[in-house]
Amino acid sequence: LIKDATRINLIETTEMIEMGEEPVRAIRKKKDSSIVRAAVAVKEGQADAFFSAGNTGAILAAGLFIVGRIKGIDRPGLTSILPIAKPGSGAKNFVYLDSGANAESKEKNLLQFAQLGRFYAENVLGVNNPRIALLNNGTEEDKGDRLHKEVHQQLKAQRDLNFVGNVEASALLAGEADVIVSDGWTANAALKATEGTAKMMLTLIKNGIENGGLRAKLGYLFLKPVFKKIAKLMGTSTYGGAVLLGLKAPVVKTHGSADALAVENTIAQIYTMIESKVIEKTVSYFGQVRSEE
């Protein structure tokens, strides 16, 4: 995508938003920070998108208050692309939102997240008629609190959504849906629990190899290619960054520890978003919904 320096324009800034700063106050005070300057460039049409590995809250605030929401969207959803770990499932990854932008959500927010996820899965991931699921504490239709029961019924009633029902956190990576929708608090907690379990299992395997004697070490040598394949599948660098869907342009957050591969894949991710016109299609859809209300 970027073969030489002719497509790179460096803009010097004089301020920096630190990781621990309060997001809204920081973007209002530090107008010459890279996050604010990038968001302003997108708003003014000097850039098509922006991504950063900086302060997550500041990126979200800049996206919301500077780039701006799509009309008809009440709250943007932070969208992660996660791997599907179940063999033979067909798909390699799925859309997961809201993964932490909104601690509390209403029914209409989750319905909007489902539509945002559908457009992303169709246009960026190339999934035809994506399966939409609701993250819940059981697969039965009557499971969950009042919010989840009501959202389940409303998703079921949406004719333009391929709603397949509830999915439990234990099946998060099992490939049961192409888009999994949740409120930000629940989704973030489930995601961190999954990440924590994966790290714990890796630690146990590593300790078992190191303390298991010669047989364990020989076994590791035979299985090393398998471990590398799993690491690539589950690695955060493989799938790009987390997109704040529901804004007027692509705004993407990458990990603070992002390596060159993560940056490359994030740029490719943004390129696909722009080329597929997923934002324009989303704007058109919600504009039509508003006109029919």
Task: Place the predicted regions along the sequence by residue.
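Metallocofactor- and cofactor-centric catalytic cores in central/energy metabolism, strongly enriched
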Residues: 5-24, 162, 167, 234, ...
